[in-house]
UniProtKB/Swiss-Prot annotation:
Binding of Mg(2+) 2, residues: E27, H141
Catalytic activity, reaction form: D-ribulose 5-phosphate = (2S)-2-hydroxy-3-oxobutyl phosphate + formate + H(+); GTP + 4 H2O = 2,5-diamino-6-hydroxy-4-(5-phosphoribosylamino)-pyrimidine + formate + 2 phosphate + 3 H(+)
UniProt-annotated binding residues for Mg(2+) 1: E27
Binding site for Zn(2+): C255, C266, C268
Active site: D327 (proton acceptor), R329 (nucleophile)
Residues involved in GTP binding: R250, V251, H252, S253, E254, Q271, E293, G294, R295, T315, T350, K355
Recorded metabolic or biological pathway in which this protein acts: Cofactor biosynthesis; riboflavin biosynthesis; 2-hydroxy-3-oxobutyl phosphate from D-ribulose 5-phosphate: step 1/1; Cofactor biosynthesis; riboflavin biosynthesis; 5-amino-6-(D-ribitylamino)uracil from GTP: step 1/4
GO biological process: riboflavin biosynthetic process
HAMAP family: RibA, RibB, RibBA
Species the sequence originates in: Bacillus cereus (strain ATCC 10987 / NRS 248)
Site positions per UniProt: Essential for DHBP synthase activity: H124, E162
Name used for this protein in its record: Riboflavin biosynthesis protein RibBA
Length: 397
């Protein structure tokens, strides 16, 4: 249904337009996107004729500073915090509204010699400032346009236009597919662009290494930062893992209540201890401790989910009632850490098939799933049964 990111990049490099869709739980819309560097009056005319939306120009913060583009409003109350600046026209234009003059304004924005005084305000081009980090920080069309431009090796600026149906309603995926077919345009998703960047870019940095004696044995501890957020992760390494042989690995998501306080609501603490003990017995392995509290929703939201469970909701229903997916974890950062450690073939300590799929999506091969089942307790029987019934965990209860 959708095209590969590589196909879209090739078309963009040729000055063509692509369609980019965002998540159905976000705006659930599609935009025409082109590279600002290659913009022509013909492309602008195509967008306004067949897209019918507002023509905007996503740019980096650097462009906005050079052109002295102030925010459109002092207090942005837009639900998605779209970073509009004041609208502009180049001083050489007349009304600024024609396709030719809009293309002129866009091209002059990219002119290194241009400065703020070269543009009238307000105007008919609407710059948008993309978040640093692109779609990995904000999954919007603004960031997608700048990311695509950078991936093409072009100036980090795009031209976007929302696609509206002839009856005035927003075009959704079925409409967008028809549009893409009609005009022979590549169609991609922001979700796929995020996955592409996670797969092709190095997002983790090895910060510090120490020797860590524990009750289970002595491990080589390696601390990692990442460029997506402020979360810091740690890998506990045992023995020589550089032989190329499959390595026993446990990817453990942080659980303060279970790991530290010994909560009986879950089996996280016992799993952590059992994994460390098993790696120690084998004399070789890795425990990767990921700061993904509460399956990615954070500590306070996990406690809120616990409160809902006390009211009769199960662990999945509680997450969804709070507005989160059942499992918000992403294994891209963890996969990059494992690859930084030189691992390729894993014997994965897990009961979760989704974790296997999540890691294998990043060119890691799970040779064997090693079960890690803990005895159920009265307090967590329902929780564990829900993980089996709704999350597909492989447990014998």
């Amino acid at each position: 249904m959708f095209h590969r990111i590589e196909e879209a990049l090739e078309d963009l490099k040729q000055g063509k337009v692509v369609i980019v869709c965002d998540d159905e739980n976000r705006e659930n819309e599609g935009d025409f996107i082109a590279l600002a560097e290659y913009i022509t009056p013909e492309t602008i005319n195509f967008m306004i004729t067949h897209g019918r939306g507002l023509v905007c120009v996503p740019i980096t913060e650097g462009y906005a500073e050079r052109l002295q583009l102030e925010p459109m409003v002092a207090h942005n109350t837009d639900s998605h915090h779209t970073a509009f600046t004041v609208s502009i026209d180049h001083v050489s234009t007349t009304t600024g509204i024609s396709a030719h003059e809009r293309a002129t304004t866009i091209r002059e924005m990219l002119n290194p010699a241009s400065k703020g005084a070269d543009f009238n305000r307000p105007g008919h081009i609407f710059p948008l400032i993309a978040k640093e980090g692109g779609v990995l920080r904000r999954a919007g069309h603004t960031e997608a346009a700048v990311d695509l431009a950078q991936l093409c090796g072009a100036e980090p600026a795009g031209v976007i236009c929302e696609i509206i149906n002839e009856d005035g309603t927003m075009a959704r995926v079925p409409d967008l597919l028809q549009c893409a077919k009609q005009f022979d345009i590549k169609m991609i998703t922001i979700e796929d662009l995020i996955a592409y960047r996670r797969h092709h870019e190095t997002l983790v940095t090895r910060e510090v290494e120490i020797t860590l004696p524990t009750d289970f044995g002595t491990f080589h501890a390696i601390g990692y930062s990442n460029s997506l957020d402020t979360k810091e992760h740690i890998a506990l390494v045992k023995g020589d893992i550089s032989t190329g042989e499959p390595v026993l690995v446990r990817v453990h998501s942080e659980c303060l209540t279970g790991d530290v306080f010994g909560s009986c609501r879950c089996d996280c603490g016992p799993q952590l201890h059992a994994a460390l003990a098993q790696i120690e017995r084998e004399g070789k392995g890795v425990l990767l401790y990921m700061r993904q509290e509460g399956r990615g929703i954070g500590l306070l939201n996990k406690l809120r989910a616990y409160k809902l469970q006390e009211e009769g909701f199960d662990t999945v229903e509680a997450n969804e009632k709070l507005g989160f997916p059942a499992d918000l974890r992403d294994y891209g950062i963890g996969a990059q850490i494992l690859k930084d450690l030189g691992l390729q073939h894993l014997r994965l300590l897990t009961n979760n098939p989704r974790k296997i799929a999540g890691l294998q999506g990043y060119d890691l091969e799970v040779i064997e799933r090693v079960p890690l089942q803990m005895p159920a307790k009265e307090e967590n029987k329902t929780y564990l049964q829900t993980k089996v019934n709704k999350l597909g965990h492989l447990l014998n209860l």
